[in-house]
């Protein structure tokens, strides 16, 4: 890879020597998967770090979404956002449910609670919001609506690792939250994911479902799948957990630099930190007003690429624009004006712990010039 290339993200890696030492222990034990000691330890350490009661590890970030819907026995219609990675909606479809899109709040990029009630029908059983870019949803407003109509709430928290509101982990909201530990995330286990739940009964059910439905050596209690995390990635995750706070702080410093440099650039806007929130700086999206900036989003995107700077248009196109979902009534662009506006103007700038001062300045100069 070109050494001068500035990538949009870069994986947080544990020391190779430290990881090799743990691998040797795993080799000696000959226990490489199926709820081994590293798996148990990582679940325990993550629950403490995230300030949640229970964590169940998965082999990637999509399977927790699929399994959460199964665990809560969701049927019918699920209200969700079109402004996310497509796995959010795929999980609904794979469970035989119908996704119903509602528009977003332009101040956050998250599902607009004011749009939810109008989308509820007698077939609605759940709401699946996303903490977009790690910015917390209005969890109280969403929960009030869910309680009023007897709906379950499953948060796709793929971007929200370690995010807190007034000192409380955001993953305590709703009935279940799911996480992605993909290599591109703030915290990664190479590939991986997790589910957060609030009681031991649900934890047991989910652990059964991710292990083919086995509740014992000879008893299957439901149609489960195999989505367990192995010992190697669990060990990797334990090591990465020790350095994730430093990585988040490094990201914070990048965000400070971007904001200071870009705040006065006409036609470029971005999100500021929310009061009382411990952010994780998963992404740094900017929004391009072509008329004011003098260049379209796609022109700036191409300019960055020509200079060896890889941004990403997260999330363009909207999920509702993919052929699989375009025919849904709720996918009508007239129903989703704010989501379309954001999708058509966004570029996520390079954001990771490994960016040098020179890298950051190159990104800034490309936008300011």
Where are these regions (language model features)?
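PLP-dependent aminotransferase-like
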Residues: 1, 70-157, 164
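N-terminal "arm"/small-domain region of PLP-dependent enzymes with the aminotransferase-like
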Residues: 1-32, 350
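Phosphate-binding glycine-rich loop
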Residues: 31, 35-77, 83, 91-94, ...
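PLP-dependent aminotransferase class I/II
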Residues: 37-45, 49-53, 114, 118, ...
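Structural detector of well-ordered beta-strand residues that form the stable sheet scaffold
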Residues: 56, 79, 100, 153-154, ...
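Histidine-centered beta-alpha loop that forms part of the nucleotide-sugar donor binding/catalytic region
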Residues: 83, 97, 104, 158-159, ...
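Conserved active-site segment immediately N-terminal to the catalytic lysine
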Residues: 155-189, 204, 216-221
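Short beta-strand-to-turn element immediately C-terminal to the catalytic PLP-Schiff-base lysine
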Residues: 180, 193-199, 238
């Amino acid at each position: 890879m070109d050494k001068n290339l500035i990538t949009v993200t870069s994986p947080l890696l544990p020391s190779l020597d430290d990881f090799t030492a743990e691998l040797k222990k795993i080799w000696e034990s000959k226990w490489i998967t199926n709820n081994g000691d590293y798996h148990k330890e990582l679940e325990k350490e993550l629950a403490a770090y995230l300030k949640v009661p229970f964590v169940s590890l998965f082999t990637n970030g999509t399977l927790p979404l699929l399994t959460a819907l199964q665990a809560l026995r969701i049927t019918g219609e699920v209200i969700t956002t079109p402004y996310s990675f497509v796995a959010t909606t795929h999980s609904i479809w794979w469970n035989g449910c119908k996704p119903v899109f509602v528009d977003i709040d332009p101040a956050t990029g998250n599902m607009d609670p004011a749009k939810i009630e109008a989308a509820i029908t007698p077939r609605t059983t759940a709401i699946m919001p996303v903490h977009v870019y790690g910015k917390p949803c209005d969890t109280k407003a969403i929960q009030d609506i869910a309680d009023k109509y007897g709906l379950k709430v499953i948060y796709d928290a793929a971007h929200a690792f370690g995010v807190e509101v007034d000192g409380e982990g955001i993953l305590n909201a709703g009935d279940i939250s799911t996480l992605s530990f993909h290599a591109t995330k703030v915290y990664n286990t190479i590939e991986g994911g997790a589910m957060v739940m609030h009681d031991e009964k649900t934890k047991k059910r989910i652990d059964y479902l991710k292990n083919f439905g086995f509740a014992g050596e000879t008893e299957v209690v439901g149609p489960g799948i195999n989505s367990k995390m192995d010992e190697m990635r669990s060990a990797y995750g334990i090591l990465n957990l020790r350095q994730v706070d430093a990585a988040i702080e490094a990201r914070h410093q990048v965000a400070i630099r971007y904001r200071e440099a870009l705040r006065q650039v006409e036609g470029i806007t971005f999100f500021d930190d929310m009061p009382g929130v411990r952010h994780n700086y998963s992404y740094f999206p900017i929004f391009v007003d072509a008329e004011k900036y003098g260049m379209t989003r796609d022109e700036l995107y191409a300019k960055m690429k020509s200079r060896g700077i890889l941004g990403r248009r997260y999330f363009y196109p909207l999920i509702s624009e993919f052929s699989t979902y375009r025919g849904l009534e709720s996918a009508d662009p007239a129903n989703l004006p704010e989501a379309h506006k954001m999708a058509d103007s966004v570029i996520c700038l390079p954001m990771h712990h490994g960016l040098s001062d020179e890298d950051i300045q190159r990104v800034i100069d490309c936008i300011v010039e």
